[in-house]
Amino acid sequence: PAPAPHGVVVKVMANGVCRSDWHGWMGHDPDIQLPHVPGHELSGVVEAVGKDVTKWRIGDRVTVPFVGGCGICPECHTGNHQVCDAQFQPGFTHWGSFAEYVGIHYADVNLVALPDTLTFDTAASLGCRFVTSFRAVVDQGRVSAGQWVAVHGCGGVGLSAIMIASAAGANVVAVDISEQALALARQLGAVATVNANQVADVVEAVVEITQGGAHVSLDALGHPTTCFNSISNLRKRGKHVQVGLMLADHSTPAVPMSKVIANELEILGSHGMQAHRYGAMLAMIQSGKLAPEKLIG
């Protein structure tokens, strides 16, 4: 492709695949119009630069959030590019990175420079699951040391959240139906695990482990059951963060609203992360507090 005046073309060096891609090729995403090129977890090198781009040069090593902002709408003006009114999503609203080259719009707003010490493979793995989890745990959940955090679903997003919450000093309880996933969760910092297929009541199990309920709980899977359990296992005034996508038949889950009201619970969404927040995450990676390469399979 040729770069837009405000965009760049990136030579793709590495890609990731995630559940959002699955939703796309299953037809759950109305933004996708065929023919289409998916791919939104990417890293690479700037190959061409649009005439209005000021911050980037050919040869720069870069990655990009999977939700990009236009830089001029009201949400972007408040720094919330991840909910931009005219958001750009490679692989969804536009052709993506499952190709040799990909066009990235609004480059001065959305591109992220990669440290020389970060490999392209690791950088691509940050693109969706890790940055999504970082924002969910750090910015939305506001997790702090000593808190109890429950993570429902130990796929890529959930395991990333476990690593990040543990690095923040939280006590993490991981919930899944796979013993293999739960074993990996323990390796990444979970202090307790719950196999949802082996307990009578997931909510009771988490409340017992946390001695009253989690301060913060994440549904990292995106299913009516995990959403309900995540809200229900909170202690009073706790925070539920919905990270896993809930599309198609799962888009209108039951919510224990009486408990939300009586216990003053917070229900928060989390949708990607802005390019300007990558610095905090990359600093933790470079210091050794986070090791996303452990999640590459």
Name the predicted role of every residue range:
Residues 61-62, 116-199, 204-205:
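Mid-domain Rossmann-like dinucleotide-binding core that forms the NAD(H)/NADP(H) cofactor-binding site
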Residues 55, 70-152:
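NAD(P)H dinucleotide-binding glycine-rich loop of Rossmann-like/cofactor-binding domains
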